[in-house]
Amino acid sequence: IHEIQFGYVERPTHRSRGYDQQRFEVCNHRYTALCDNSHGCAVLNDCKYGVGVEQNSIELTLLRAAASPEMASDQGEHRFRYGFTAWSESFAQAPVVQQAAAFNDPVWLEAGSLQAFSAFSTDAANVVIDTVKRADDESGDLILRLYESKKADTYFHIRSDLPVETLIPCDLLETPVGRAAALKAELHVRPFEVS
């Protein structure tokens, strides 16, 4: 399983067909996982997106150093991190998406104290809030871009410590596409849906 933007793609771990042999390296975003119905493991990365999987091995591409189209590509100093995580449950129940996000955007600690505050969160672990931004129309509205990350039809709620009362569904161009709902309303996303 390889993470892609707003979801994942499953690819075979064998090279028994001709086109599988040519696919010795594929891209991923923050993780690549090997798993079955009861357990699994994943390699997490923060900036290197080439990976090869064969049987039970994951190979990582650190540098390409191709001579074309740029003679000096990948030359110089590189900094990157890899992590490893494992779980003893199905992939659908595993926290790998959250672990990959935390690995890529670690928490920074500062001295002092603050009250607990969460601008936005969901009550479904597989529904990820990817973006919070001001609306392009300069109305002052906030846009939440979220997606379903585990290929599961999901009902969920959004929670906020901000004074938000109403949600208005919109498409990726920020055009309203549904009726306004109260913040406490139950919402729905289809598998891998971006909302």
Regions found by a protein language model. Name each.
Residues 1-195:
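C-terminal (or distal) subdomains of carbohydrate-active enzymes
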